[in-house]
UniProtKB/Swiss-Prot annotation:
Protein name: Trafficking protein particle complex II-specific subunit 130 homolog
Organism: Arabidopsis thaliana (Mouse-ear cress)
Residues with PTM N-acetylalanine: 2
Protein origin, superkingdom: Eukaryota
Similarity comment: family membership: Belongs to the TMEM1 family.
Region (Disordered) residue spans: 479-526
Keyword Acetylation: yes
Organism lineage: Eukaryota, Viridiplantae, Streptophyta, Embryophyta, Tracheophyta
Function: Specific subunit of the TRAPP II complex, a highly conserved vesicle tethering complex that is required for the proper transport of proteins in post-Golgi trafficking pathways to the growing cell plate in mitotic active cells. Required for the polarized and selective transport of PIN2, but not PIN1, to the plasma membrane. Not required for ER-to-Golgi as well as biosynthetic and endocytic vacuolar transport.
Residues spanning the membrane: none
GO biological process entries: cell plate assembly; cytokinesis by cell plate formation; Golgi vesicle transport
Record bears the keyword rRNA processing: no
Amino acid sequence: MANYLAQFQTIKNSCDRLVAAVEDVCDLWPTVKGLFEEHQPLKRAFLTNKTRNPVFVENLPVEFILTTDARLRSRFPQEQYLFWFREPYATIVLVTCEDLDEFKNILKPRLKLIVQNDEREWFIVFVSKAHPSNDQATKNVKKVYAKLEVDFSSKKRERCCKLDVHGPEGNFWEDLELKITECIRNTLDRRAQFYEDEIRKLSEQRFMPIWNFCNFFILKESLAFIFEMAHLHEDALREYDELELCYLETVNMPGKQRDFGGFDGEDDQAVLLKPGSKPLTQIVQDDSFREFEFRQYLFACQSRLLFKLNRPFEVASRGYSFVISFAKALTLHESVLPFCMREVWVITACLALIEATASHHHDGVVAPDIEKEFFRLQGDLYSLSRVKFMRLGYLIGYGTDIEKSPLNSACLSMLPWPKPAVWPSLPQDASSEVLEKEKTILQATSRTKHFGIQRKALPLEPSVLLRVANRRRASLSTGNIPEMFDGRPSFTEGSGLEASPRTPSSLKVQAPPMSRTNSSPGNFESPLDRPMRLAEIFVAAEHALRLTISDHDLLKTLSSIQDFENKYLNLTKGAAENYHRSWWKRHGVVLDGEIAAVCFKHGKYDLAANSYEKVCALYAGEGWQDLLAEVLPNLAQCQKILDDQAGYMSSCVRLLSLDKGLFSSKERQAFQSEVVTLAHSEMKNPVPLDVSSLITFSGNTGPPLQLCDGDPGNLSVTVWSGFPDDITLDSLSLTLVATNNTDEGGQALKSSAATVLNPGRNTITFALPPQKPGSYVLGVVTGQIGRLRFRSHSFSKGGPADSDDFMSYEKPTRPILKVSKPRALVDLAAAVSSALLINEAQWIGIIVRPIAYSLKGAILHIDTGPGLKIEDSYGIEMERYMDADCDTGASKAEVFVEDSPVSSKRDSEVLNLCDGKIVFSDWASNVSSILWVPVRALSEKLARGSSSVTPLKQDILEGMRTVALKLEFGVHHNQIFERTIAAHFTDPFDVTTRVANKCNDGTLVLQVMLHSLVKANLIVLDVWLDLQDGFIHGQNDGRPTSTFFPLVVSPGSRAAVVFSICLDKSMSSEGKDLQLPESILNIKYGIHGDRAAGAHRPVDADHSETDTEGRDLVFKSAIVLQRPVLDPCLTVGFLPLPSDGLRVGKLITMQWRVERLKELKESEAVEQQHDEVLYEVNANSENWMIAGRKRGHVSLSEEQGSRVVISILCVPLVAGYVRPPQLGLPNVEEANVSSNPSGPHLVCVLPPLLSSSYCLPVK
């Protein structure tokens, strides 16, 4: 089967479509050929793939070939079996007939003979030539076609279709497409099954000696080609994948040694996308193929199918993996391959993949993640070719022009040198080139970095090239001549990405003779020739590469340093651009740094600065300070050349922020010097700069500063300076940020004067104005150095005191300041709640309680309200306040005295009131104290007594006085507490009178009851009564009938005195005015009380304490004596209630009878209308509802004994004992009215009766 390999490849190259055979029985093909070809390709075809699943194929091309064509006739049976993929997949039989007898006798037997082959997939196309106007011909055609369908079609399968040449086409072409598709599907399934069976048989023998890979390949690729022609690209790709796996399993079978290949012309150029670059007959070897060409052929077939599937991403992914794995295979055979064959092949392969996949890729067609991954692979391909290209450039002497950056050093120092069997020798006529190379090497000088930074150049080689090249020369042995080491230390050979085990000795036996290789020892002057110099090694490698490289474009890029830089720049830009569009944007930024180095070399400082900024931002963000130290000086130099003062200053600060071990002290001082010089130079505009990595700050150790709402303070902050020397800050500000609301921003605290920061730790104190309540953390430190405005938002951990350079950039969660919410810092309250004596100098107590806050230097403003004045002539006493409530809450509300630095020995002090305010003493700053202020409540109103029948109600507000207090305290008296306290002043006694008895001689016994109104012992020394007109004393002196003085009245108790009085009958009411309208009760008394409890002995500022004790007090009260109730003018009587009683909700009539007992004198009358009496009914609205008139006039004759009844309708509202409504006569004095009953009384109101509507019968 392997003998047919050439014919197989020829047939495969000539077939690109499925074939449908046309059996033209009636010479109809010339007529219908054009119509058939117009309807190609098949628009909608459903085929079956290898797994027997239906697959929709769009636009399936089919080629129609007559069965009489030589392409189908000139084949031997063995060829048909071997190349079955090119056989027809469908047979179309073209017939026409208009005579039924002709069909039966001639056409039908012929058709039976044609379709009797079971292997064919056939159907019949009946072509009607009858014109629509010829009815007879049309009828005959229909009869013939009907008979044709009966004879050749069945229920399982319809094998006939009709094409009307002159009539409408109808759905013929759809029917034709379905029938062709059905035939192709059946044929495809049968042939695929045949190939699978044959392939399975061969696969089972692949580890046997009789195994022949060529036979397996022909069958496998035939099946793949069938699927490819049927546009089943997925199945075809799967076949090629299986073919590749099988080849890799069998290519290196032990006992079979095959040539690797790669010795032909242009083999250095990868043919990953050109499957027909070499005929298969040229790469066949025994029963298999050479690995070098065949693996590329398989990948080219796979990539062709992937491009048809519109998967350039998969081509790039597979291509990158293939390049890596194939490069390892090249490494295994490197000793027999041309010099640097691996590097050249990798470069061409990567560039070919990049060009092909980029041309097939369209943005936005695939998903975004796949698109990004595609660009990542493009970047990888560019990077791989870039590294290999740099290796070639270094081998020919361009290493001095390659930037010794961390990236280039990492790539090249891990990439091994080429390992030919013998290093290329120097041509005899290359002396001039060697001289030129030596001159270039001597003139090459490393670029001096800015700030005079001295750095050891990063290596670009895995080991010393001079040693490696000389060691691989055939006539030298390692270490014979010291010159080969060139005075350098010995390095271990590196192993890069493509490093692999040593080449087997069997592969180093003999290389096939070829004119291109430079691996031969060459001509030497003696058996032991001298070692090659470095320039000679470069020249020898360059000549060897000229023989290896067949690509003129690649060869041109290595011909001069300018072309090399251009190609290097293009590869770097391609990699960077693709990485920027992928996930690996950091790789693109790093490559931007390599582009920046080239731009800097050629004076394009603006482009270099832009790229360097991206690289520095990446390195800083990742924390790669070693790499940042390599690139940042280059950026600073570009900015200085471009006169970018802000950028240059920022770069200097960033250089200072790096680890101290990366630069020497002298270099760091140079950085600081540049910053200070620029800051104080004549810059156009102030430069804002973030120095967060250089200046950090933290709060001091310990608890946060505690302040109350509205209090100022001093805040100490630790600032860490990363400058190597002292630096003076013109201004420094610190921002505090509230933890509960960070959106508002913080308040800036400014330092009062210039600040000098020493290297390391510094403690700075800021004046803290009052802050809002909440917790505060450090926000931002800002300041200014000359024209430089700096800002830092980094925080230090606040390490141990001895680590002055310990800095961190983590934001602390511990607050530095806590301002408590508004709370009570002090409490002012009245010391006494009971009443004091009115019109007498009394001590009023004010309790001052500090609540966990110092009152040192506090000022209390005292302002009395109306009716109250302070006795200025007497000092204000201040005492320590110690009561039970205060002691209990001291642990929560007060600061202990021993915690205060103020001495606690003093317990009292006399303070002077100045301009209505007093200043607290220091001893009272942290303890509760009480202030005794002498005041006097003024009242010109004379106290009035009341009758026991109608007692007067005491008006509490009448004796109330207020004192407005305002306390200013705090460090700057910024805290203000205001409160108004009330004090109750009253008379010592409440006087009540009643007539106890009336003697037969007209003498009245008047009982005067004295009720103590204060919490003190009142001592009654003497009492006398000044009677009003119309009354005289039974005794001439006006004293009580019995005297038991001094009489002590305890707090809240009662006492009584009795007077004997008579009516003054000699007094005439006509023509005489009243001289004393009311009686005056005089009481001389003393008082024993405590000012801490209430009323007490008055304060007299004009006398000494001894005089005050001897001075008695006099209390006067006015009492009204009514005319005796036994001699009234009118009487009001409450008539009895109904016998059934009162009930809630029941309407009743209340009645009062008014009767005139005697005529009313003119002097006793209130109005002149004596025949009318004004009445008024008073009732509690909560207990009674009045239905009638509450107020009105009734007629009452002036004659003695006349009477009238007043009736009022009302409804009781509540049950129980309540006071009934009362009838009063407003225009008649109480002395002229007698009531029955005489005083208030109660009536019983029953609950309402139960209603039957709400009752349930009891069963």
